[in-house]
């Protein structure tokens, strides 16, 4: 499994909204500037996150985006799967119809263990966890 640029940027976008989570709407251009990411690229990502119900939008002068839940209610896994799709290390773990060799495959056990390890990390790590870990290591940093 390799996390794409889209996945990394989605995490950074959600972390930025989480860090600045006051209930107010944050313009996407502000996030783009803070994260040094193209606002056009973030528009594509925010659309997926909005469609999934992770963020709420408002138009107008005071418009922008905000989280629909608290940072401790979002896991890295659900964010990545929303923009990346499956996090399986090999395609045969995703298939609804496994390949002919699935039952006798010598490597499938390893791939399943890798999948479990990935899921164990991303499904048990929240935005809040990531922010807390970062701040513990960088106490003088206000924004990430």
Language model features: what each stretch is:
Residues 26-36:
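A short alpha-helical element within helix-turn-helix/winged-helix DNA-binding domains
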Residues 33, 50-51:
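Alpha-helical residues within the helix-turn-helix
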Residues 40:
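Key DNA-contact positions within bacterial/archaeal DNA-binding proteins
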Residues 46-47:
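Short, hydrophobic-biased segments on the C-terminal half of alpha helices
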Residues 54-67:
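Beta-hairpin "wing" of winged helix-turn-helix
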Residues 71-95, 107, 111-116:
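Conserved segment of winged-helix/HTH DNA-binding domains
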Residues 95-144:
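C-terminal regulatory/oligomerization modules of transcriptional regulators
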């Amino acid at each position: 499994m390799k996390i794409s640029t889209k996945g990394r940027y989605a995490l950074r976008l959600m972390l930025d909204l989480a860090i600045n989570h006051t209930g107010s709407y944050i313009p996407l251009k502000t996030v783009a500037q803070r994260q040094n990411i193209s606002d056009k690229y973030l528009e594509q990502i925010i659309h997926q996150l909005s469609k999934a119900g992770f963020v709420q939008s408002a138009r107008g002068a005071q418009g922008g985006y905000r989280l629909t839940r608290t940072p401790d209610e979002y896991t890295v896994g659900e964010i990545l799967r929303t923009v990346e799709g499956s996090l399986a290390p090999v395609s045969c773990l995703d298939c609804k119809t496994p390949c002919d060799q699935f039952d006798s495959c010598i490597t499938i056990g390893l791939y399943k263990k890798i999948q479990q390890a990935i899921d164990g990390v991303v499904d048990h790590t929240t935005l809040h966890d990531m922010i807390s870990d970062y701040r513990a290591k960088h106490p003088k940093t206000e924004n990430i």
